[in-house]
Amino acid sequence: MNKTPYCTRLIILVFVIFSLFTIFPPISHINFAHAADKYFLRGQKLFKKCIHCHTYKVAQTHRIGPNLYGMFGRKAGKVVNFDFSEAWKNANFIWTEKTLDNYLLDPHKMIPNNQMPFDGLSSASDRKALIIYLKKIVQP
């Protein structure tokens, strides 16, 4: 006959289960974090080409291109103290993940006569990575 009280056994069981989940997080969580890190790191590498013309932190001055800080949810071609070309001033869309993906795919199709020296990213995976990275670094 087991002399350990029911309450004590229950406490031990809860402790063991809690310890297992603390030491070994669920596999899906590990895979998701790894995938997100993979895209973030790829986006960071891709963005190195962008920083020659763009800044991305609050209160940084513009370069050849506008500061990208706070771009998601903002109307394209509208940034305080930046003089956009007529093509950009006439842009009629809000920056979202979808519009940025379309722009990154073919910038000159989306904004004809756009002066930005960027021909686009054909790789959907690269566009996804750059968008994930930008969402992390340019949002307030």
Pin down the residues of each PLM region.
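The canonical Cys-X-X-Cys-His
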Residues: 43, 48-56, 130, 134
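N-terminal secretory signal peptides that target proteins for export/translocation
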Residues: 1-8
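Short cysteine/histidine-rich zinc-coordinating motifs and their immediately flanking basic loops
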Residues: 62-67
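Detector for the c-type heme attachment site
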Residues: 54-60, 73-74
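C-terminal capping alpha-helices of c-type cytochrome domains
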Residues: 94-140
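Electrostatic cytochrome c docking/interface patches
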Residues: 29-47, 58
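C-terminal segment of classical bacterial N-terminal signal peptides
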Residues: 18-31
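Short Fe-S-cluster ligation motifs
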Residues: 78-98
